[in-house]
A protein has these predicted regions:
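Transmembrane helix segments
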Residues: 32-40, 150-190, 194
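Membrane-interacting alpha-helical segments
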Residues: 2, 6-13, 17, 167, ...
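Hydrophobic alpha-helical transmembrane segments of polytopic membrane proteins
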Residues: 127-150, 168-171, 222-229
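Transmembrane helix-boundary elements of multi-pass transport/secretion proteins
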Residues: 3-78, 87-107, 113, 117-132, ...
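Juxtamembrane/transmembrane-helix interface segments of polytopic membrane transporters
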Residues: 105, 109, 113, 143, ...
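Transmembrane alpha-helical segments of integral membrane proteins
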Residues: 110, 195-205
Length: 240
């Protein structure tokens, strides 16, 4: 598992464009958002915390799904699965590697948002970092899972409108979930991104850890673990 993680990390260090997408792009997007709302800092506070979790989720989803698919199309996965490692260990290795990147990504985005851009949070910035990290890990898990159903990198990207966009629309970022049509609200209640946004809002509004925050974090973490298990089950050694 650690050998797989080390190999993936070494590959990433030789791909500066991917590193830029993972680490720099979320920071640039948060910075852009701050100056879009330059005349309304309260609006940045209200949306910035939520997007601090959403941006890492999206970037990790894209990079993980494409990177895993590339491993399969080049025959690397087939060779690795011939070893005694097993699918579960292989997925755990990928998750460990991209999880390490997620730590750097989330820490940098949180630090820039809070201490440089002035994101006003009532709770601890460390809790903000925790939710951002779990969101990035969820994006990693989703990327590993959907890569099993794509035959090309283009198809991997096509999963984004199906997997990410509905969650983005229903997570409560644009309107409170309780104000949605009852059917849409019910759907949003089972989508992990909804709890990611709720968790960020809990840190934004409350100085202490609340029961709702614990629930939100547990749902996001549990969803990531569940999707990782599904990814191990559906992992293919060859392109379908």
């Amino acid at each position: 598992m650690t050998a797989t993680a080390g190999r993936v990390l070494r590959q990433l260090t030789h791909d500066p464009r991917t590193i830029a997408l993972l680490v720099i792009v979320p920071v640039l997007l948060i910075t852009l958002l701050r100056y879009v709302f330059d005349g309304a800092p309260g609006t940045f506070d209200a949306t910035g915390a939520s997007l601090l979790g959403i941006f890492p989720l999206i970037t990790m989803f894209l990079v993980t799904s494409i990177a895993t698919l590339r491993e399969r199309t080049t025959g690397t996965l087939e060779r690795l699965l011939a070893l005694p490692l097993g699918k579960g260990g292989l997925i755990a290795g990928y998750a460990l590697a991209f999880g390490a990147v997620a730590v750097v990504q989330s820490a940098l985005a949180t630090a820039v948002s809070v201490w440089l851009l002035g994101l006003d949070v009532v709770g601890s910035p460390w809790l903000l970092l925790l939710v951002a990290l779990l969101d990035a890990l969820l994006g990693t898990a989703l990327g590993l899972f959907v890569s099993a159903f794509a035959a090309s990198e283009f198809q991997a990207v096509q999963f984004m409108p199906a997997v990410i966009f509905p969650q983005l629309l229903l997570c409560g970022l644009f309107t409170p979930r309780e104000a949605m049509h009852p059917v849409l609200e019910a759907i949003s209640n089972v989508l992990p991104m909804s709890y990611a946004v709720d968790g960020m809002n809990q840190v934004l509004q409350h100085p202490d850890i609340t029961g709702d925050f614990v629930r939100d974090v547990a749902v996001v973490a549990g969803s990531a673990l569940l999707v990782l298990c599904l990814g191990a089950i559906t992992l293919r050694s060859r392109t379908p």
